[in-house]
Design a protein with these regions (language model features):
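Conserved short S/T/G-enriched processing/targeting/catalytic segments and their helical context
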Residues: 1
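Alpha-helical protein-protein interaction modules
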Residues: 4-139
Length: 139
């Protein structure tokens, strides 16, 4: 960063790196700086945002960015994350709906132990807590 603080990819990569140290607000600052400097590639830079917001325990921010990603690049992971977000936010019925959709799309995941194998480490606690609240069985 010291060599080229105005390079968008450097800001993005630095933001990713400092998430490993729990510096989520600083990471967001660098990622949003990359987006501002290189708006044509914003979708590439935004993919990490749902994870950072979940890691922060910010359900509202996570929900915004999961919906954005789901609209742009549909994938089963987003149904699981929506289940976790809504579970943590207390909307258990909606969490259960998203969990059912996720499990239908991912038959290899039947319980918490299965999901722990694929959950992103950065936001594991938030996601697992939300999925438990949504009703993902322990075994």
């Amino acid at each position: 960063m010291e060599l080229n603080p105005n390079h968008p990819a450097c800001n993005h990569d630095y933001g990713l790196a400092i998430t490993n140290h729990g510096r989520f607000d600083d990471a967001l600052e660098h990622i949003f700086k990359a987006i501002k400097m290189d708006p044509a590639r914003h979708r590439n830079y935004e993919t990490i945002l749902p994870l950072i917001y979940m890691a922060k325990g910010d359900g509202e921010g996570a929900l915004k960015w999961v919906k954005e990603q789901l609209e742009y690049r549909p994938h089963s992971r987003y149904q699981g994350w929506l289940a976790a977000i809504h579970g943590n936010e207390g909307d258990i019925e909606l969490a259960k709906t998203h969990l059912a959709s996720f499990l239908e799309q991912r038959p290899e995941i039947t319980n918490q132990a299965d999901y722990e194998k694929v959950v992103p480490t950065i936001c594991k606690d938030f996601v697992m807590q939300g999925l438990v609240l949504a009703g993902l069985p322990a075994t």
